[in-house]
Curated annotation (Swiss-Prot):
The gene is P4H7. This is Probable prolyl 4-hydroxylase 7. Residues 274-314 form the ShKT domain. One of its GO terms (molecular function) is L-ascorbic acid binding. It catalyses: L-prolyl-[collagen] + 2-oxoglutarate + O2 = trans-4-hydroxy-L-prolyl-[collagen] + succinate + CO2. It comes from Arabidopsis thaliana (Mouse-ear cress). It is found in: Endoplasmic reticulum membrane. Residues 25-316 are lumenal.
Length: 316
């Protein structure tokens, strides 16, 4: 099957997983005696996936936006902020031509990146993100922690790429998850200027003028916002244009997880040199898995395996 057709089919399947009849609406559990015969059973908070679909609201189809209330606990939010404090640097943007990270007045926040699986809390949140989005952990970039002080913002932008260099690292960012780590007294809303139903959202004086330019979501500690940057046919979605409105009162902390079409982890490691991509590689190699399971462990020149370093298939 042509890879583009397969990708488009996969995306169509992914985007139809949260089957919801109208916006906004809640994920519901349908009984098995539905008239049309379609049976959709959503698990509750006791789910082994570690997330509760009953807390998810579909906000929009154009772009595809979902809000998860209480995705993070207060302890998780506070832990992320603690990890970031003292390590923040001025936020950068990707140059549209070269793909290099450059400073810009478009983005005035400060931030830092956590390491993947940095500790148990980070690992648990990464697993929960994969369960909610139905996208593999390895497709995600490291989480970025952002801090916005009074007046700081991120003007409307796209999360998909315009340069070839970034596309080589797992392809486009298919989805973005914004996690709010703090409450904001006023401002700091996430705004979607291109949302077709923006006129239906009534806003009082508690919203900033920036937020009134589109459909907007107020930051609330623990909530998470998932939106897709690509259409189901794998083309870029201009409706996903979004920004972070200036903070007017207080401060804003958030965490961002960008998720790619393909494995970001493998593409990044391939560029970085000879590396293992699983913590158990050395143990597996000693057990003879390099010979027993060469496809996974070693791979080929075109499709590298996950344990090339331990299998001595490359030199660091």
């Amino acid at each position: 099957m042509d890879s583009r057709i397969f990708l488009a089919f996969s995306l169509c399947f992914l985007f139809t997983l949260p089957l919801i009849s109208s916006a906004p609406n809640r994920f519901l559990t349908r009984s098995s005696n539905t008239r049309d015969g379609s049976v959709i059973k959503m698990k509750t908070s006791a789910s082994s996936f570690g997330f509760d679909p009953t807390r998810v609201t579909q906000l929009s189809w154009t772009p595809r936006v979902f809000l998860y209330e209480g995705f993070l606990s207060d302890e998780e939010c506070d832990h992320f902020i603690k990890l970031a404090k003292g390590k923040l640097e001025k936020s950068m943007v990707a140059d549209n031509d070269s793909g290099e990270s450059v400073e810009s007045e478009v983005r005035t926040s400060s931030g830092m990146f956590l390491s993947k699986r940095q500790d148990d809390i980070v690992s648990n949140v990464e697993a929960k993100l994969a369960a909610w989005t139905f996208l593999p952990e390895e497709n995600g970039e490291s989480m970025q922690i952002l801090h916005y002080e009074n007046g700081q913002k991120y003007e409307p932008h796209f999360d998909y790429f315009h340069d070839q260099a970034n596309l080589e690292l797992g392809g486009h960012r298919i989805a973005t998850v914004l996690m709010y780590l703090s409450n904001v007294e006023k401002g700091g809303e996430t705004v979607f200027p291109m949302w077709k139903g923006k006129a239906t959202q009534l806003k009082d004086d508690s919203w900033t003028e920036c937020a009134k330019q589109g459909y907007a979501v107020k930051p609330r500690k623990g909530d998470a916002l998932l939106f897709f940057n690509l259409h189901p046919n794998a083309t870029t979605d201009s409706n996903s244009l979004h920004g972070s409105c200036p903070v007017v009162e207080g401060e804003k902390w958030s965490a961002t997880r960008w998720i790619h079409v393909k494995s970001f982890e493998r593409a990044f490691n391939k560029q970085s040199g000879c590396m293992d991509e699983n913590v158990s590689c050395e143990k597996w190699a000693k057990a003879g898995e390099c010979q027993k399971n060469p496809t996974y462990m070693v791979g080929s020149d075109k499709d590298h395996g996950y344990c090339r370093k331990s299998c001595k298939a490359c030199s660091s």
